[in-house]
């Protein structure tokens, strides 16, 4: 781009030098050039480095396009703007010599015409921010330098974790409610199983106790026939002696309750025999008493 400007500016100088070149009479403030001024300019040119135009060989072709605008005051009292666009870094040396006013005036007028002759789409591009090229961003990423991001470059940023976690945060209350419901269901199931187990244990204990009570009653059963036969009725007119003898005979021939349980029929027969013997002995004693009284 600089190379094109360097070609374009000398052509404009050669075409319009007759019309734009002011005379010394028209510019009274301009002084003639001296040898000292030329020497100072040569020294300044020696100190200023020469920047080669950007091309593909030197690696500066993909640098950012920068625009510089300078305002200068003309001897007539008007101001002119100098606009420079370049793809490389520029260093400007400002000189405060009065002898250079003629050349600056010529340059300002030429650059004003060039800026007005530029198409409108270039002016529109100036207002938009300069987006760094892909290769410059890649080089800066490799070198480890910080890259300044513009508005358009924000599209390349990764999604922040806060935005990702926002959707997950909405689902967290649902998960918490589900966990609480599961815990309540498990606790209710355990309580129900405990109640069922307790009822089963109480029922089995009641049955075992009832069976043991029945077994005790079966061991000590009473035969009603034997109870009526062994029961003595004193109202039948038997004397005390016969009662005592019958008691002695019953004790002498008596049987225990265990013998009665073992053989129910044998005990009944023995009781009958003892009753018969006791009755016979009572009758004999009664007859003897009557004979003695006679």
Curated annotation (Swiss-Prot):
Keyword Cytoplasm in annotation: no
Location of the region described as Disordered in the Swiss-Prot/TrEMBL record: 107-126
Pfam annotation, one family: Afaf
Signal sequence, renumbered to the chain: 1-14
Subcellular location: Cytoplasmic vesicle, Secretory vesicle, Acrosome membrane; Cytoplasmic vesicle, Secretory vesicle, Acrosome inner membrane; Cytoplasmic vesicle, Secretory vesicle, Acrosome outer membrane
Glycosylation (residues): 76, 143
Topology Cytoplasmic: residue spans: 203-294
Tissue spec. comment: Isoform 1 is highly expressed in testis. Isoform 2 is expressed at low levels in skin and blood.
InterPro entries for this protein: Eqtn/Afaf
PTM characteristics: Highly N- and O-glycosylated; contains sialic acid.
One GO term of the biological process aspect: endocytosis
Residue intervals annotated with topology Vesicular: 15-181
Chain ranges passing through the membrane: 182-202
Alphabetized UniProt keyword annotations: Cytoplasmic vesicle, Glycoprotein, Membrane, Signal, Transmembrane, Transmembrane helix
Primary localization: membrane
Membrane topology designation: Single-pass type I membrane protein
Listed GO CC annotations: inner acrosomal membrane; outer acrosomal membrane; plasma membrane
Subunit-structure text: Interacts with SNAP25.
Function: Acrosomal membrane-anchored protein involved in the process of fertilization and in acrosome biogenesis.
Database matches in PANTHER family: EQUATORIN
Name of protein: Equatorin
């Amino acid at each position: 781009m600089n190379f094109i400007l360097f070609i374009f500016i000398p052509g404009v100088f050669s075409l319009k030098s007759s019309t734009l070149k002011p005379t010394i009479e028209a510019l009274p403030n301009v002084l003639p050039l001296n040898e000292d001024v030329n020497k100072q300019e040569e020294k300044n040119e020696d100190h200023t480095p020469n920047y080669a135009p950007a091309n593909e060989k030197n690696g500066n072709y993909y640098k950012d396009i920068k625009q510089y605008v300078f305002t200068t005051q003309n001897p007539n009292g008007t101001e002119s703007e100098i606009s420079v666009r370049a793809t490389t870094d520029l260093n400007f040396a400002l000189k405060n010599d009065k002898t250079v006013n003629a050349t600056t005036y010529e340059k300002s007028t030429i650059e004003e015409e060039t800026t007005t002759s530029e198409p409108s789409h270039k002016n529109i591009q100036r207002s938009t921010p300069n987006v760094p090229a892909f290769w410059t961003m890649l080089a800066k990423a490799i070198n480890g330098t910080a890259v300044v991001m513009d508005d358009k470059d924000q599209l390349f940023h990764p999604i922040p974790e806060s935005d990702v976690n926002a959707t997950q945060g909405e689902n967290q209350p649902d998960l918490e409610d589900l966990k609480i419901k599961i815990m309540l269901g498990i606790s209710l199931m355990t309580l129900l199983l405990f109640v069922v187990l307790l009822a089963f244990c109480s029922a089995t204990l009641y049955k075992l106790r009832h069976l043991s009570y029945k077994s005790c009653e079966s061991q000590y059963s009473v035969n009603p026939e034997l109870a009526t036969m062994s029961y003595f009725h004193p109202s039948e007119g038997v004397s005390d002696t016969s009662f005592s003898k019958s008691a002695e005979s019953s004790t002498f021939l008596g049987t225990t309750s265990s013998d009665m349980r073992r053989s129910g029929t044998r005990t009944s027969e023995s009781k009958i025999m003892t009753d018969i013997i006791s009755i016979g002995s009572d009758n004999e004693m009664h007859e003897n008493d009557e004979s003695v009284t006679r």
